[in-house]
UniProtKB/Swiss-Prot annotation:
CDD domains: KH-I_PNO1_rpt1, KH-I_PNO1_rpt2. GO terms for molecular function: RNA binding. Keywords: Acetylation, Nucleus, RNA-binding. Belongs to the PNO1 family. Expressed in liver, lung, spleen and kidney. Weakly expressed in thymus, testis and ovary. Weakly or not expressed in heart, brain, skeletal muscle, placenta, pancreas, prostate, small intestine, colon and peripheral blood leukocytes. InterPro entries: KH-I_PNO1_first, KH_dom, KH_dom_type_1_sf, KH_PNO1_2nd. The gene is PNO1. This is RNA-binding protein PNO1. Residues 43-54 have a biased composition (Basic and acidic residues). PANTHER family: RIBONUCLEASE Y, RNA-BINDING PROTEIN PNO1. Part of the small subunit (SSU) processome, composed of more than 70 proteins and the RNA chaperone small nucleolar RNA (snoRNA) U3. The modification N-acetylmethionine is found at M1. It comes from Homo sapiens (Human).
Length: 252
């Protein structure tokens, strides 16, 4: 036995480590509690130092409109289909005047590319002028009257929305024609009623429907048109949109 103990001690001296029995569950639990307590103390100290030393946020000065417009000239191009050449030519001065005089932009009709081109210049003061002018011309190209499309320049909360009848219901042939007829009504009565109740403007161009108005009003008009496409009778649609319009009027 003594010789065995001597060999073990010699091995330990040579570099071998002795294996000792690990502690039980209680010892492990006690050790974990000590580590967690030390960690919480460290976190608390770290939080105290962070609160004492607040992070500095960078402060940038606000950009002015002149600074945004001082860069390169911006251009918008609106393609014109063949069926809108004549109306564009007849109403060119009504389109040209507000864009040039009120918004301070430059506009021309490119005969080669068949596009209406609008660009900024030194006289442009408003950052959003180019977008307003492009929406105005686009609304006229889609079929709206100049007086109705002009509201896109005067008011900020007006939008354009377009969708196809076949997006609501995949109709073909006579079924599609009947759906278009239900939206328009006899002599345009149904379309005019929806426009007056929802305070919007609607253009029916073949299978496409274009709506001009505020967000809430566009939503009401779109719901009414979708119900007509799905086959609801006009009298029921009238009642629904009048009820919704009266509720929204009371709310505001």
């Amino acid at each position: 036995m003594e010789s065995e103990m001597e060999t073990q001690s010699a091995r330990a001296e040579e570099g071998f480590t002795q294996v000792t029995r690990k502690g039980g569950r209680r010892a492990k639990k006690r050790q974990a509690e000590q580590l967690s307590a030390a960690g919480e103390g460290g976190d608390a100290g770290r939080m105290d130092t962070e609160e004492a030393r607040p992070a500095k946020r960078p402060v940038f000065p606000p950009l002015c409109g002149d600074g945004l417009l001082s860069g390169k000239e911006e251009t918008r191009k609106i393609p014109v289909p063949a069926n809108r050449y004549t109306p564009l030519k007849e109403n060119w001065m009504k389109i040209f005047t507000p864009i040039v005089e009120h918004l301070g932009l430059q506009i021309r009709f490119n005969l080669k590319s068949r596009n209406v081109e609008i660009r900024t210049c030194k006289e442009t003061k408003d950052v959003s002028a180019l977008t307003k002018a492009a929406d105005f011309v686009k609304a006229f190209i889609l079929g709206f009257q100049v007086e109705d499309a002009l509201a896109l320049i005067r008011l900020d909360d007006l939008f354009l929305e377009s969708f196809e009848i076949t997006d609501v219901k995949p109709l073909k042939g006579d079924h599609l024609s009947r759906a278009i007829g239900r939206i328009a009504g006899k002599g345009g009565k149904t379309k005019f009623t929806i426009e007056n109740v929802t305070r919007t403007r609607i253009v029916l161009a073949d299978v496409k429907v274009h709506i001009l108005g505020s967000f809430q009003n566009i939503k009401m008009a779109r719901t009414a048109i979708c119900n007509l496409i799905l086959g609801n009778p006009p009298s029921k649609v009238y009642g629904n949109i009048r009820a919704v319009a009266s509720r929204s009027a009371d709310r505001f």
